[in-house]
């Protein structure tokens, strides 16, 4: 599900078929004021927060995640959650790309290369940290076999979300000219 408003604020849930089971990548996107925006480790808010979970997000479970994932280290997590992460936009590049797409244009590759990212993760937690599932539990459930596989999947899915996110925002800026 992709339940974001025209400004890109809301919740997105991606269902991942691993051939053995399903996982869900849950995203909470919010608006940050310029005062709230920082890449420093002491930040308390981020443009997007994520979790990779092995439990299907029912209404109740999604609400539990909504109350905890945006809090990151201050939230409460269980072995159902495999990874916890967060990211901030490159506001300059995100706005540039969404403006170009809204105008029906493709962004200039040189501009993309100058910054290199739409969003940048500022932390990726796994392996039992903050109550998340540890590697042995993940292996017992036959979800992943090697260390850091869940974290790398989470980072990859965050990148995929960033493309969907910027296109969503661009479309809502100008549905008639968006490409």
Question: Model segments located where?
Answer:
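Amphipathic, interaction-prone secondary-structure segments
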Residues: 2-43
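Mixed-charge, Lys/Arg-enriched low-complexity segments
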Residues: 44-179
